[in-house]
Amino acid sequence: MANASEPGGGGGGAEAAALGLRLATLSLLLCVSLAGNVLFALLIVRERSLHRAPYYLLLDLCLADGLRALACLPAVMLAARRAAAAAGTPPGALGCKLLAFLAALFCFHAAFLLLGVGVTRYLAIAHHRFYAERLAGWPCAAMLVCAAWALALAAAFPPVLDGGGADDEDAPCALEQRPDGAPGALGFLLLLAAVVGATHLVYLRLLFFIHDRRKMRPARLVPAVSHDWTFHGPGATGQAAANWTAGFGRGPTPPALVGIRPAGPGRGARRLLVLEEFKTEKRLCKMFYAITLLFLLLWGPYVVASYLRVLVRPGAVPQAYLTASVWLTFAQAGINPVVCFLFNRELRDCFRAQFPCCQSPQATQATLPCDLKGIGL
């Protein structure tokens, strides 16, 4: 959106420097997004310990962010160069609609996928047996991925069917809305806000669930009912029945033990969520919620600007705020690998195992056998 300056004036150098800085920043975002997302995708594919449903969903999210950066950021760079050129032609209406469709598609895919991830995280903590039996494998992850892409495809069509062209070089890859307050644009914004809000409500419900069970209740001994040495009732441990079955008891047959689950190697014999599994699931919840919160923080300013443009008037939003909000959406395409690396210790360990050259000398020394350490190696 650079204005043409007078020849020989001092504005040309400043505009050229601003254009160079903008193109360099976009190139850096493109490289970081592609390198980080492709690296994490390869790490999840190669490491067998990561072949679980949460990491399959993370793999799809990384691939979608990489595709968004590859499809959108070069187009924005080309639009910026065309706008800065003296005889540059603006991008066509078809190209703007295609880029707006791709941006809306990837945005809604991330929103719907994060909603599905939030629901599965809640089930993994609150209903662990059901999650372990029905939702822990790859079929559930494949269904969630397909559903997220299908819903995103259905939601991305309406905003670009009748929309106009882009009005600045930052807009082709942003969620272009019709500036006349059309119901399609307003419905698009309401749907996005509803999906993101529902995702945070799921995590809020999960937080309340963990808070209510943060401390174990003290065990209360309930005395068993005893008649002629047959113990039954809430406090019975079943030892009397076991003794009678083994032939050590006398008297009448003890009552049937109600509520005791038979132990066995089958799928129904899986225990409840133990402490180590709970810590693992909790770390995954923290990582995915950090991704969800950053999605809200980086897309929120642009959604607010779009609301103002739709409900008030197109010129109600300052151009500086609109440009900054669009650049925040660009940064969202490359921030997820950094968040995953910071919040997930399992991913860091797998990364060090796959790439030993990235380990520090202290970590390499810690992995040496004791006899090698003793001789100074």
Swiss-Prot record:
Domain of life of the source: Eukaryota
GO BP: positive regulation of insulin secretion involved in cellular response to glucose stimulus; positive regulation of phospholipase C-activating G protein-coupled receptor signaling pathway
Reported tissue expression: Expressed as a 3.0 kb transcript, in whole brain, hippocampus, striatum, frontal cortex, thalamus, pons and hypothalamus. A lower molecular weight transcript was detected in all regions examined, except the hypothalamus.
GO molecular function: G protein-coupled receptor activity
InterPro entries hit by this protein: GPCR_Orphan/Phoenixin, GPCR_Rhodpsn, GPCR_Rhodpsn_7TM
Localization: Cell membrane
Extracellular side stretches: 1-24, 78-98, 162-183, 309-322
Annotated S-S bridges: 96-173
Any one cellular-component term (Gene Ontology): plasma membrane
Keywords per UniProt: Cell membrane, Disulfide bond, G-protein coupled receptor, Glycoprotein, Membrane, Receptor, Transducer, Transmembrane, Transmembrane helix
Record-annotated membrane-spanning stretches: 25-45, 57-77, 99-119, 141-161, 184-204, 288-308, 323-343
Cytoplasmic side stretches: 46-56, 120-140, 205-287, 344-377
Lipid bilayer topology: Multi-pass membrane protein
Residues with glycosylation annotation: 3
Function: Orphan receptor. Possible candidate for amine-like G-protein coupled receptor.
Family assignment from sequence similarity: Belongs to the G-protein coupled receptor 1 family.
Protein name: Probable G-protein coupled receptor 27
Source organism per UniProt: Rattus norvegicus (Rat)
